[in-house]
Amino acid sequence: MAESNSWRSHRESDGNRSIPNGDDARNVRETGVQTDAKVQGQGPRLSKANLFTLLSLWMELFPKREACQQENDAAGVSGLVVVHECRVLGLHCSSAQLHAGQVAVVKHGPRLKSCELYFSRKPCSTCLKMLINAGVSRISYWPGDAELSLLSESLHHGSSSALQEAVLDATAAERLKSNSRPHISVLLQPLDCTVLQFLDETSQNADFLGKIVADNPALDTGDIYRREFWNNSDNFLEKFFISDEERHKYVLNKMGLENFCMEPNFSNLRQHMRNLIRILASVASSVPALLEDYGFFMREPVGMGSPGLPQGVIRHCVIQARLLACRTEDPKVGVGAVIWAEGKQSQCDGTGQLYLVGCGYNAYPVGSQYAEYPQMDHKQEERQNRKYRYILHAEQNALTFRSAEIKAEDNTMMFVTKCPCDECVPLIGCAGIKQIYTTDLDSNKVKHDISYLRFNKLNGVQKFIVSVREK
């Protein structure tokens, strides 16, 4: 695990080196999902490209009730994020029947036109030709192994014919790329030097860990977080990182990424991949997996309403919301929210019957420039110069920019990283949300200009709160 141990002594400045990819990331003026803002002046936050890339990696790990092995080939599971005009239309992963790209075509069809797609693996030629034909504007992918694995030991039974097919498919995919209109590339943007440390700190201080420690003062948040972090780090590096440099160069060459094999591009690429994996490990560690019998359990009697989701799926969705919070425009109180619904019929997606309704994070109104609105909290004595009346909450943005309508017949669920405030509770109740998964650490509290008194009084919505499993 030499690669894993290398972060302990890594220089954060390495993650800031620009990665050549046709666009100079340092000279691109980033347009936020909400606020138009240059990198200068903003607090530490993930870029859109890095956020969507991390979401695609995380979707590859979506828990499945049964093993997902494609029936018709040796393709590995891929995660996919579908984005249109900075709005997330879908979070997908491969199923037993379909690759992630095929899932997108079936689920979105003509709505894929002008969309940006972020894959956790370079898609195969079968998916690429369909997506190009659908008129997508950009296809970005993680620079690890391809969907049809180019690493022989990753293939089932180590079949040489399967490896040969993977090489032929990589050649066909490269030809499709060179002759297509969409921009197909690796899109990893430089990290601000403070992002890694900031996200480590905010993950360690997340409400989910805070709830566990509040109930058990003898526990140490730092110890819990570090144990989870190093476990996640090892697992994610094994999953998403090719530790052997020569084998990594072989894969990059087969995928048409020869420029990345030359120094300093190669070292910069690998350092940036490690940094993003570290962020994913950090965020995932903020929601421990059933630590000390903790999980998301319903307050009401079990007989009321729909049954809750499996704990693994709940945790996965909450971590999606935590990743969204990394893009917040209020880094002091970053909040993320994601809405999923459970349909009645089996779907082609690797998420089973679940489909994305919407997602968001707290941010200022669309189109506003940085510092147009107050940034200060209660420390600003003049109340009219505080941020609270201007910033949109994560729950509000998830409902406003939803990609699907909320259906009365489906079980619609919201996953949010903090207890909903009194401004959001009525919206959640009236929108048709049937279940909410969150923490009640702030419930029944008043914090200066924001209160949390109405959450416990929210009727008609099942509340699944971080708590100890009943014996």
UniProtKB/Swiss-Prot annotation:
Which branch of life, at top level? Answer: Eukaryota
The record's active-site residues are E395
Q: Where does Zn(2+) 2 bind?
A: H393, C421, C424
Q: Which GO terms describe its cellular component?
A: cytoplasm
Q: Which InterPro entries match?
A: APOBEC/CMP_deaminase_Zn-bd, CMP_dCMP_dom, Cytidine_deaminase-like, dCMP_deaminase-rel
Q: Which GO terms describe its biological process?
A: cytidine deamination
Q: Which Pfam families match?
A: dCMP_cyt_deam_1
Domain (CMP/dCMP-type deaminase) spans: 57-153, 312-460
Q: What is catalyzed by this enzyme?
A: 2'-deoxycytidine + H2O + H(+) = 2'-deoxyuridine + NH4(+); cytidine + H2O + H(+) = uridine + NH4(+)
PROSITE patterns in the cross-refs: CYT_DCMP_DEAMINASES_1, CYT_DCMP_DEAMINASES_2
Enzyme class, first EC level, given as a word: hydrolase
Q: Where is this region: Disordered?
A: 1-27
Give the UniProt keywords, A-Z: Hydrolase, Metal-binding, Repeat, Zinc
> Where would one find coiled-coil regions in this protein?
none
Q: What is its EC number?
A: 3.5.4.5
Instruction: Name the SUPFAM superfamilies for this protein.
Output: Cytidine deaminase-like
The protein's required cofactor(s) are namely: Zn(2+)
Per its record, what are the GO molecular function terms?
Answer: cytidine deaminase activity; dCMP deaminase activity; zinc ion binding
Please indicate if the UniProt record lists Repeat as a keyword. yes
The UniProt similarity line reads:
Belongs to the cytidine and deoxycytidylate deaminase family.
Q: What is the documented function of this protein?
A: Catalyzes the deamination of cytidine and deoxycytidine into uridine and deoxyuridine, respectively.
Q: What is this protein called?
A: Cytidine and dCMP deaminase domain-containing protein 1
- What organism does this protein naturally occur in? Danio rerio
Q: Which gene encodes it?
A: cdadc1
